């Protein structure tokens, strides 16, 4: 019968998770699944694959080894609301044509809406063309295929349980489908076909082959593989099927939201990264694994302000690590601790120091976190969504924390990095990617407080002096009067210590000094916040700029042609 999953994944003893051998080195053992039930449906009303029998047997064997019971049928009459409720997942195994009548379709729709799972294998995409619900569920309909041949499958998501065991390039022989539409807009693509590796591809550079999605309350996984009998004897393909079934049945969690527009920071290459402090990270199979510490592997090539950062992580047991954001460049890992924020990875610490917490600042929603978390030994995916000084944390696609920074000494803008906590705290990371959101926030309407810029540093009157001509700089935020500015709503003077932010001599040349000066109402003291985060002097049309893109304390600010770069972005009160 359909069984409800009630166990917590935190603090569980590790047990052997039996799957047939994979093509890459085995990772740490994962917890055994609570028992569940799977319906395998293989009715055909068109072409019939000779691999259906061996495919059904393979799924039975996977079930026997991995905590699920299989019922196999080609009788569409089993599609009733009462009967389907017995199963956590339904596999459409090489179905073809119109296999369900309207009453049966309605029962299956109700099953999915109630949280059921769907797995489509190969010609499941050549099924039910006239049923729009099914078309949206499967993700794309079959269009054509060339002859059976060898091809390279490019695995772009190696956190999902269906693909985590696979290498970045998976070479195998099968019948390779072209589809009528690209599934990427509605599903998370897990793997694509490299059309340069075989003949007859018809979708170009982006040819999805396997994907997953959440759909109207349920879960769906589809793979284009599985035409040949030999497929079901391949250990890697069997594990691929198993992972898809586990996801559809709700036994493994994954972020299956559509994903586009991200830039890779790490997927095997460490270019642009630097190690701060002791310890290191090993780099093998496009996977970083922490060694020793306490140190920090940080992306030193660029700082970020408004962005979505995604990464995949796995810990083998009760381990400790975290993702740091919003810190200035430094070879000292404690700079990130003292100036930025850590989103924690730790199975068993206190609630404000465990997985999903903004370390010591705000606990995750523990119930939501536990429901979304895969246990030690399995991969998880974080999204850290930073918009101004607001941070939202998503675990496997589920929001588990929402935090707003109000500390004038810290900021969410700056560098990002991953922690190597110490010997024995072994956490691995994959596929670190980022999407910069740009000027998504409207300009402020005026207020009093700090003006934060590059690396979260504050606009500062040097030495808190009040003499006309005092240099303006950036400095670590400290809440002093030298960093307390009053911004005029809609544009105008920006004041601190009773005087105004001023362009020296009313100049317009790049590099003109920015200083403190007695307020005089001239254009040299007229500043307007822009939607892209810059602060523009209206008279010159140029921007307040941190010299040399240098975030060190004491770096001067000057006037410069507006570029929208990070050293011209300011968060105003």
Language model regions located:
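Extracellular ligand-binding/catalytic regions of CAZymes and related secreted enzymes
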Residues: 32-36, 42, 50-53, 57, ...
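Catalytic beta-strand/loop cores that center a nucleophilic Ser/Cys/Thr
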Residues: 140-217
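Carbohydrate-interacting regions of secretory-pathway proteins
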Residues: 257-441
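Secretory targeting and sorting signals
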Residues: 1-32
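Low-complexity, Pro/Thr/Ser/Gly/Ala-rich linker/spacer regions in secreted
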Residues: 30-35, 249-264, 436-450, 490, ...
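A glycine-rich, often tryptophan-bearing local segment used as a flexible ligand/cofactor-contacting loop or short
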Residues: 92, 97-166
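Aromatic-rich beta-strand patches that line glycan-recognition/binding surfaces
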Residues: 321-331, 470-476, 512-518, 556-561
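Extracellular glycan-recognition/adhesion modules and their associated mucin-like linkers
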Residues: 441-466, 481-509, 523-551, 566-573
